């Protein structure tokens, strides 16, 4: 059964445009509450990032959940992985995140966690969608849900993050710059690193509801690079608006992406005999990651793009680590979803154990030139991926790469974009192929 509302990462869109409207969120809260109540007494945690529309949608969801008889526990602004963790520790039936991740404040969205802190199973999402098409009813007044606020949510999550670091380990003397993207990590991330001993300079931690991800964070890393160089820091850490993505900058100002961070974490676990299986990447993971892991005899598999698919592959194989080059990194020995702060801590510990700088550690992975071009296709009725001219051109590029590269065309699960990716050994050749394919995709979408 196809989904009407849920994409690869929940429901997302422009605020005020259906379905990102208060009336829909009221109905969604009710439908979710009715679905979760089938498990018995229902308790749902609700958290959000720092965008201004979060207050409006929090109230709407709260009312809908209560109307269905679900008790609601409000977390306030918290990183997405913190909501997953707290859902688990409070033994709730589900957690709801109000966030549009790395998108600007004009967007917002909803995603759900199961009681185990994992992404909601497909069958539950489909049940919620079916309920959304039914008339909304209200339970008897004696069975209405109650609403409370968890005042120590941030402190609980800070202690959880610190517990992932051995008590014998300290980051004394480590000079960090941390970019919080004016987002959900703005309170907890600086506290975690400081309480573990690091000297922390904080950037972009003054959210006003409108500035989340604006020229900062993991999608705009230039100011972090400058701050690392000016402050002579050991490295910089950039989070996205909801705290499930992380990128780093080494002391030279070079960007260290999710593939490189994943390799550093996996190699450290491998060195200590604690890797347990292999590593899960995605179709977008750089070929260099696969080759570097192969040199260490570490198995590598590719999942579909999206951290939910990485997580599903990890669970099926009972492996520990996986991630995306965008900075979603999952460490199943600590978390049930991508957690940017936890991933950053694992990288810092790996560097400390090896006595390496981040710049030295990233040299072990030689990335192949990879060009990614996003092509917007708007309201076009043409499916560019099925167009004969696009399929023929893609096949010809694959043939030209002669087994020494890859071509990938895919639709974004959250935006009206086609992502054109070409990877190979010669950067000039790769860029030429990518630009030609992107131009063709744009032409057939007109």
From Swiss-Prot:
It is an enzyme of class 5 (isomerase). The modification Phosphoserine is found at residue 101. It catalyses: alpha-D-glucosamine 1-phosphate = D-glucosamine 6-phosphate. The active site is at 101 (phosphoserine intermediate). One of its GO terms (cellular component) is cytosol. Belongs to the phosphohexose mutase family. This is Phosphoglucosamine mutase. Activated by phosphorylation. Keywords: Isomerase, Magnesium, Metal-binding, Phosphoprotein. GO terms for biological process: carbohydrate metabolic process; peptidoglycan biosynthetic process; UDP-N-acetylglucosamine biosynthetic process. Binds 1 Mg(2+) ion per subunit. CDD domains: GlmM. Mg(2+) binds at residues 101, 240, 242, 244. Catalyzes the conversion of glucosamine-6-phosphate to glucosamine-1-phosphate. It comes from Pseudomonas putida (strain GB-1). The keyword Magnesium applies. It comes from the Bacteria. One of its GO terms (molecular function) is phosphomannomutase activity.
